[in-house]
Amino acid sequence: MTTSTAASLPAPRTAEVSRNTAETKITVKLNLDGTGQASLSTGIGFFDHMLDQIARHGLIDLDIHAVGDLHIDGHHTVEDVGITLGQAVAQAVGDKKGLRRYGHAYVPLDEALSRVVVDFSGRPGLVMNVPFKSGMIGTFDSQLAYEFFQGFVNHAFVTLHIDNLKGENAHHQAETVFKAFARALRMALEIDPRAANVIPSTKGSL
């Protein structure tokens, strides 16, 4: 009885990935089927706040610790966190059997509204239209949002469309983008019990 029950349990969708370069040292641990718990330390306060949105709204347990060359700027740290997070997601997803594959979300915050659509297609691609109203959000360079998502898609092997439809406050714009990204991920990463052993593509592979 115990053996049968254990055999019927789905494999945990977890991963741990480290990236060490001359510019950054990063470790990402995650559980795609978590409850949104997070432990985050990148040295960039606003970026930690955005990563927390991914954990909380994606219901992903996320542990990210990064040490980077912030005496230069945040570029390498933000981009490399995106790369490492993408690698961890790809590892945790595995063969994609039963995956819903597609996810989308609209998220508002006061005057700001963003839409994000994701496809675990196996083909990296980013289309991002976010006209930030300010170059800096705290100590976070708003241009680095693009670098984060580009790093993520290249290594998670997803197609990602991000559109900020309305917004006058850069903080609100960024927050709606990251929250919508999280909720789109949550949808796409769900397992469809009706197709639990099927790869969601007519090709038979992704």
UniProtKB/Swiss-Prot annotation:
Keywords: Amino-acid biosynthesis, Cytoplasm, Histidine biosynthesis, Lyase. Its EC number is 4.2.1.19. It catalyses: D-erythro-1-(imidazol-4-yl)glycerol 3-phosphate = 3-(imidazol-4-yl)-2-oxopropyl phosphate + H2O. GO terms for molecular function: imidazoleglycerol-phosphate dehydratase activity. GO terms for cellular component: cytoplasm. The gene is hisB. The lineage of its organism: Bacteria, Pseudomonadati, Pseudomonadota, Betaproteobacteria, Burkholderiales. GO terms for biological process: L-histidine biosynthetic process. This is Imidazoleglycerol-phosphate dehydratase. Its main location: cytoplasm. Gene3D superfamilies: Imidazole glycerol phosphate dehydratase, domain 1. Pfam families: IGPD (PF00475). Pathway: Amino-acid biosynthesis; L-histidine biosynthesis; L-histidine from 5-phospho-alpha-D-ribose 1-diphosphate: step 6/9. InterPro entries: IGPD_sf, ImidazoleglycerolP_deHydtase, ImidazoleglycerP_deHydtase_CS, Ribosomal_Su5_D2-typ_SF. The keyword Repressor does not apply. It is found in: Cytoplasm.
